[in-house]
Amino acid sequence: MTMLKDPSKKYRAFPTIDLPDRTWPSKTITQAPIWCSSDLRDGNQSLIEPMDSEKKLRFWKTLVQVGVKEIEASFPSASQTDFDFVRTLIEDGHIPDDTTIQVLTQAREDLIARTFESLRGAKKAIVHLYNATCPSFRRIVFNQDKQGVKDIAVNAAKLFVKYAAQQPDTHWTFQYSPETFSATELEFAKEVCDAVIEVWNPTPEHKIILNLPATVEVATPNVYADQIEWFCRNINRRDSVIISLHTHNDRGTGIAATELGLMAGADRAEGCLFGNGERTGNVDLVTLALNLYTQGIDPQLDFSDIDGVRKVVEECNQLPVHPRHPYVGDLVHTAFSGSHQDAIRKGFAKQQEGELWEVPYLPIDPADIGRSYEAVIRVNSQSGKGGITYLLEQEYGISLPRRMQIEFSQVVQGETDRLGLEMTAEQIYKLLQKEYLQANAPYALVSHRLQEENGSSHVQVEVSGEGETTLHWHGKGNGALEALVAGLPVNVEIMDYNEHAIGAGTNAKAAAYIELRVAGGRPVHGVGIDENITTASFKALFSALNRSLSQQQAKAA
């Protein structure tokens, strides 16, 4: 079978919502929602190999450490393992006073009774009821009309009241999800939820949660936002209801749907860390939280050690986080492109502590989430001088002059093309050594002697020449470099000179950079590093001289 030329024969567009006076497009998110993690329930049930109790407890502790205050821990009536895990959390004291355990149940009395039994002894708990409400489920899965679906929800809601009353020492919060809400007629979704509200009789002081899932993502995020705004406007006793979102990512817009849903009036967001969940996954709570953070809003979740969180999630889920995953992927703070690297390097150079973050291409400071800057710029065949310069500066304290950046980037480019691989900072430094610091032929500086007399500099140098000959050159000038140039056997013109310290204190070294021309040829650069600045400058001159002469010989050959 192939894709249809006319997909309208098989698929139909989801109808738009008639909401001409919608207000959500002009709203902004100004505070974090109530967060609920479903990693241990929705996320766990979607794994090829569900977590064992040890992994579940490790994941639970990570969620608590991050700051998630409502955690859906299991489906206690589904298995003894899930039931026992809830008991472990309660009996062994793993639920902090500021954290609420949430569990899920279907709408059958035996399952509801088992669910409430699993929570015996909990200080507080959210019990989550659901049944599907959309036309396709009513028709295909349950063979129920609207009244039948509504009756299922109402009868189960009454059972919640019954079983909660048997454990009066627990502070109960009831939650209802019209599963497949986003594919359900809005009027009917409201009708069912209003009926549940009447049974549970919430107040502004003791609210219930209405969770409105995009169980399967069926439309663009703006449609979901319209549904949420319509629902918030029309549901009964809105002041006694927490509106919760539970989006999936079937169309790739779960994040956007949740953000627009919050703009449309929702109070709460359910999801999983890094977007695990059925099919294409639940909405990613990490991305949602850090999207808020980068807009200057406290997300009320702490991802200061995001790689530590990722490690736990990957090991428990046995699923890798994609290298391009927002904020946490291995490559998301990495630039290979030359123009990107140059902009980032300049941004870091100008960024001051305490100022608004404005480094190009980096929407978040990697340090805020526990990332180092080492992987921000990496060098491959697409890289330019900015990335190379940044790595040398950060790792080795070497600040190449601008024109030398251009020259050396061509050397690196040739090497990456030859290797067909990325180059590390160490490899780049070794290439710098080979190309410049070890450029000792045809002339190698052995020693030098400098005397100052009557404002003039006198230089004597011992040089190892070709064929292991020893040469002695003498020169005089207004400074050490000018004196050395005067003593050279070839005509040399210094075009540019730069120097700086590497490190500080007794271990500091000097780096010198020279750009020169030999006999009117093209400019060539040299580098010298030494504890003594004069020696470093002499080494830089010999580096450039030898490179120029070697290039001339190669061209002549």
Swiss-Prot record:
Membrane-spanning ranges: none
Keyword annotations of the record: Amino-acid biosynthesis, Branched-chain amino acid biosynthesis, Cytoplasm, Leucine biosynthesis, Magnesium, Metal-binding, Transferase
Molecular functions (GO terms): 2-isopropylmalate synthase activity; acetyl-CoA C-acetyltransferase activity; magnesium ion binding
Transferase found in the keyword field: yes
Cofactor dependence: Mg(2+)
Pfam entry (one): HMGL-like
Region (Regulatory domain), start-end ranges: 439-557
Residues of the Pyruvate carboxyltransferase domain: 33-307
Top-level taxon: Bacteria
Subcellular location: Cytoplasm
Enzyme class: transferase
Magnesium found in the keyword field: yes
Binding annotation for Mg(2+): D42, H246, H248, N282
GO cellular component entries: cytoplasm
Catalytic activity: 3-methyl-2-oxobutanoate + acetyl-CoA + H2O = (2S)-2-isopropylmalate + CoA + H(+)
EC number(s) reported in the record: 2.3.3.13
GO biological process: L-leucine biosynthetic process
Functional pathway: Amino-acid biosynthesis; L-leucine biosynthesis; L-leucine from 3-methyl-2-oxobutanoate: step 1/4
Gene3D superfamilies: 3.30.160.270, Aldolase class I
Quaternary context: Homodimer.
Record-stated family: Belongs to the alpha-IPM synthase/homocitrate synthase family. LeuA type 2 subfamily.
Function description: Catalyzes the condensation of the acetyl group of acetyl-CoA with 3-methyl-2-oxobutanoate (2-ketoisovalerate) to form 3-carboxy-3-hydroxy-4-methylpentanoate (2-isopropylmalate).
Cited HAMAP family: LeuA_type2
Protein name from the UniProt record: 2-isopropylmalate synthase
Species annotation: Pseudomonas entomophila (strain L48)
Organismal lineage: Bacteria, Pseudomonadati, Pseudomonadota, Gammaproteobacteria, Pseudomonadales
The gene coding this protein: leuA
